[in-house]
């Protein structure tokens, strides 16, 4: 370390898109990168997901000295950088999908739940992008960081904090250099199961020299007062959402009720199973994910074409035919064969895939239920802070510099406590 050393922050991706933030903090010969996701743009209809294609379409950042040279063809400058590390905030693909592209010698940190769940989610090789020289279902080593325990990366220290998002085990990050502190929220909200965790992170981050905050909640100003706004309709918090699913069951005692949720929203699923008046039955693939990651057993069923999982308890299997014939005993997760559901039934789509109107697959997916005279109810609870919550988080941290990312409209987030910068891709800020 010399007197001339400065903390720099370089913004490589995810600045005016929903997802895909890639940001480097550097000091002297040490640097860290977060996150490692891919921007979701299904409308591009890309020919492949090669490194070159992703770079060309700006779906990942063109970050030097972090990607695997086997993929980029460019060596890592180990003379310039003596200490390197990377971090992912949570399970969602716009923050994790390209982690296998990281050079294998660079340590990758995540919260303990994220580190444990990612290999399980990628068991079939269809979650993460593949690593060079490995089978497609390989997941590179991820170090499960202890919450709030400092991680030394040369002159830089990382501290990982539990947070709240609709991905199980989401975290926020504090990056400390010899002269500055940078806080990164990852994806964050105050209306989930753990607002107390978010407030503890806000307290730890208070007065940071820079706050890098997601801004999904200000991405649709034209829908600000629209009751049909896709991101912020329905229940105002996760507890209300669970209660509404219970109410729908109680209001429809003699009706087939099915549902689906997003695989990484494990906590919502656990709450539904815990509170449901009906017996909840999961598709075997989801039951296997829960067993593999949490070592907990739940009732499940197989579709006729499904492979069998040796870790599932045979005594908990429910036959698919029994579920199709049922209209009062079960609340079950349906993932296909929607035309086999009972006419007049009810299907609850709770932030499951396809995720919404921005996905070309969503409209035909919804329309098939009407065609089969099945009521379709979308029950969403956003994983992201809305405009009011974003102001509260910024107000709790009171940063010197605010950098909104992960939003279509970063200019709509303001910093009453200091400066706000709106960096371009590849731009470096010196603190």
Q: Locations of the language-model features?
A:
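Short, charged, surface-exposed secondary-structure boundary motifs
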Residues: 43-45, 118-123, 170, 193-195, ...
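His/Asp/Glu-rich metal-coordinating catalytic cores
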Residues: 2-17, 21-85, 94, 98-264, ...
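C-terminal regulatory/interaction regions
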Residues: 1-2, 12, 16-17, 274-278, ...
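Short, charged/polar "capping" segments at the starts of alpha-helices
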Residues: 116-119, 221, 287-292, 355-358, ...
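Hard-cation-handling environments
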Residues: 226-335, 339-341, 405
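Short internal beta-strands
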Residues: 106-116, 212, 279-289, 348-351, ...
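Short connector loops at secondary-structure junctions
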Residues: 37-39, 214-223, 285-296, 380-389
């Amino acid at each position: 370390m010399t007197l001339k050393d400065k903390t720099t922050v370089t913004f490589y991706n995810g600045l005016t898109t929903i997802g895909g933030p890639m940001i480097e903090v550097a000091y002297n010969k040490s640097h860290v990168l977060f996150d490692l996701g891919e921007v979701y743009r299904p409308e591009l209809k890309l020919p492949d997901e090669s490194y070159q294609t992703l770079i060309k379409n700006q779906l990942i950042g063109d970050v030097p000295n972090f990607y695997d040279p086997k993929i980029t063809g460019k060596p890592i400058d180990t003379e310039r950088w003596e200490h390197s590390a990377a971090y992912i905030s949570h399970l969602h693909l716009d923050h994790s999908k390209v982690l296998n592209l990281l050079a294998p010698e660079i340590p990758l940190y995540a919260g303990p739940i994220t580190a444990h769940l990612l290999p399980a989610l990628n068991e079939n090789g269809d979650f993460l992008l593949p690593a060079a020289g490995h089978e497609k279902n390989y997941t590179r080593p991820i170090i499960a960081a202890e919450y709030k325990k400092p991680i030394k990366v040369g002159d830089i220290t990382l501290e990982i904090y539990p947070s709240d998002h609709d991905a199980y085990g989401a975290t926020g990050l504090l990056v400390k250099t010899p002269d500055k502190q940078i806080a990164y929220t990852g994806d964050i909200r105050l209306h989930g199961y753990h607002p107390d965790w978010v407030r503890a992170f806000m307290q730890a981050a208070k007065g940071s020299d820079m706050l890098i905050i997601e801004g999904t909640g200000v991405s649709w100003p034209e829908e600000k007062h629209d009751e049909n706004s896709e991101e912020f309709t329905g229940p105002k918090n996760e507890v209300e959402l669970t209660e509404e699913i219970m109410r729908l069951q109680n209001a429809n005692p003699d009706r087939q009720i099915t549902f689906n949720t997003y695989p990484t929203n494990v906590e919502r699923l656990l709450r539904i199973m815990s509170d449901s008046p009906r017996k909840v039955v999961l598709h075997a693939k989801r039951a296997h994910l829960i067993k593999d990651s949490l070592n907990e057993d739940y009732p499940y069923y197989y579709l006729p074409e499904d492979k069998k999982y040796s870790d599932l308890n045979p005594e908990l299997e429910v036959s698919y035919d029994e579920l199709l014939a049922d209209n009062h005993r079960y609340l079950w997760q349906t993932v296909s064969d929607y035309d086999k559901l009972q006419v007049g039934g009810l299907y609850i789509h709770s932030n499951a895939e396809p995720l919404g109107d921005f996905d070309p697959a969503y409209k035909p997916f919804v329309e098939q239920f009407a065609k089969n005279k099945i009521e379709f109810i979308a029950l969403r609870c956003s994983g992201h802070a809305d405009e009011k919550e974003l102001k509260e988080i910024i107000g709790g941290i009171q940063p010197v510099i605010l950098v909104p990312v992960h939003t279509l409209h970063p200019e709509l987030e303001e910093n009453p406590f200091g400066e706000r910068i709106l960096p371009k891709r590849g731009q470096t800020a010196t603190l």
